[in-house]
């Protein structure tokens, strides 16, 4: 295996954060990201950037973090006892965009790198990440575009990669207590070290760079569509599922809180507004009902 180049990964992630913020600001047309640079007492720090009350984006955050320490947290060593007693570095870019317009889907992306080292032993490293889409209203062409781009960026790495990571995404972003997916999926991968370092890094870069190509055309298509109170209420209700997933299931949230990560940055993914309603059911034949019947379960889109 080729030797991991931590500095190269960090440089890419910082540049990626800049590029994504620039692209989202252009798509929004009015809002700007405000940066909050922070340091972690145990080692490391990051740049949290938040855009609020934009023309398109109600609230969005793009976070870069790089944390390191002398010992792994319990959440990481529970499944990987070989990591115990190793110093570690974890770095990544994660983002969530919550648009105003209910016809524009919420999107999430994350790319990350992890390495654990011990004197006299080979380092243990891997990449993880992916992106996923959470529409509130069903537009099949948007979902097909999202998945087509996902498949295209996986293609150079093998024809089996898209089906594998697409399926992983469907399984990961699943709310067991609701028996529904969080959205329509995309790609999800973790523990990626099956190829030499350079190839694994290239795949992570392709996913990171692919996010804007996947999301911005959908934003452009939907951001000017007229909507009313009914659509807004449904959007806020569905955002409740986003909150449920992030607080109950998301491994990144758990890891961040257990490593003494920065709470404001970890919970940046939360929507600014959400609502719950007891035993709400969609009307038969409505677009909302179609979302439930055809979109909130794993399916082949291509």
Swiss-Prot record:
Subcellular location: Cytoplasm
SUPFAM superfamilies: Coproporphyrinogen III oxidase (SSF102886)
Important for dimerization: annotated segments: 242-277
Site (Important for dimerization): 177
EC number(s) recorded for this UniProt protein: 1.3.3.3
EC class: oxidoreductase
Catalytic residues, chain numbering: 108 (proton donor)
Residues the record lists as binding substrate: 94, 110-112, 260-262
Binding site for a divalent metal cation: 98, 108, 147, 177
Keyword tags: Cytoplasm, Heme biosynthesis, Metal-binding, Oxidoreductase, Porphyrin biosynthesis
NCBIfam families: PRK05330.1
Subunit structure: Homodimer.
The name this protein goes by in its record: Oxygen-dependent coproporphyrinogen-III oxidase
Upper classification of the organism: Bacteria, Pseudomonadati, Pseudomonadota, Gammaproteobacteria, Aeromonadales
The gene coding this protein: hemF
